[in-house]
């Protein structure tokens, strides 16, 4: 199932930040990074403020990585507005 999501510049930025942290963590552990790497390249190539189609697996990966980033920001006492906005789009 494909879902169309409009990505603003802030949405792209927070998603790429979350995916990059996940990518480097998985690479350090020696796990497969092909799926997350492909998604990073896909999101990076998208123009801002345009709708893009994402599969259920891609949405799950984005949702889980952004949620982890949000939890890390909350633990540090940082603002989570950008992560919250993107999470709402993914549900």
Model-found features: residue ranges?
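Positively charged, low-complexity terminal tracts
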Residues: 1-91
């Amino acid at each position: 199932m494909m879902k169309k999501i409009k990505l603003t510049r802030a949405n792209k930025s927070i998603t790429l930040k979350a995916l990059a942290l996940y990518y480097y963590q998985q690479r350090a552990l020696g796990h497969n990074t092909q799926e997350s790497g492909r998604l990073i390249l896909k999101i990076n190539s998208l123009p801002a403020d345009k709708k893009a189609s994402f599969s259920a697996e891609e949405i799950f990966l984005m949702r889980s990585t952004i949620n982890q980033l949000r939890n890390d920001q909350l633990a540090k006492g940082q603002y989570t507005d950008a992560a919250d906005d993107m999470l709402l789009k993914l549900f």
